[in-house]
Amino acid sequence: QWLSFLGEAYEGAKDMWRAYSDMREANFKGADKYFHARGNYDAAQRGPGGVWAAEVISNGREALQGITDPLFKGMTRDQVREDTKADQFANEWGRSGKDPNHFRPPGLPDKY
């Protein structure tokens, strides 16, 4: 059972990385919430280990962005807080098994 959990976590982490890589490649305005939801959704489909990996990675990413966004994007604390809230909503949406296409922006290439 523990080995299964670790395998799910590993595969879930790969799902999260794939969504992040696709987001960077697409470079499509307004698509970040879709990729957040999709990565979490795909990881969660792996099982409890995937859910765990998605949550740890999502929370870590948001904590890091709380530091880097004000420095590199010039965002205020309020802007960071709102963006984090929206990102976490999309993360939880996907992790709970809801369709990530809810956040898909019009015009995003079908490849994603």
Curated annotation (Swiss-Prot):
Pfam family, one: SAA
Annotated localization: Secreted
Biased composition, class Basic and acidic residues, residue ranges: 75-86
Record organism: Ovis aries
Family assignment from sequence similarity: Belongs to the SAA family.
Gene3D superfamilies: Serum amyloid A protein
Gene, per the UniProt record: SAA1
This protein's GO CC annotations: high-density lipoprotein particle
Protein name: Serum amyloid A protein
Entry keyword Secreted: yes
Protein role: Major acute phase reactant. Apolipoprotein of the HDL complex.
Region feature (Disordered): 75-112
Annotated keywords: Acute phase, Amyloid, HDL, Pyrrolidone carboxylic acid, Secreted
Chain positions found as Pyrrolidone carboxylic acid: Q1
Expressed in which tissues: Expressed by the liver; secreted in plasma.
InterPro entries with a match to the protein in the record: Serum_amyloid_A, Synovial_Prolif_Regulator
Induction data: Upon cytokine stimulation.
UniProt-listed PANTHER family: SERUM AMYLOID A, SERUM AMYLOID A-3 PROTEIN
A single GO BP: acute-phase response
Disease named in the record: Reactive, secondary amyloidosis is characterized by the extracellular accumulation in various tissues of the SAA protein. These deposits are highly insoluble and resistant to proteolysis; they disrupt tissue structure and compromise function.
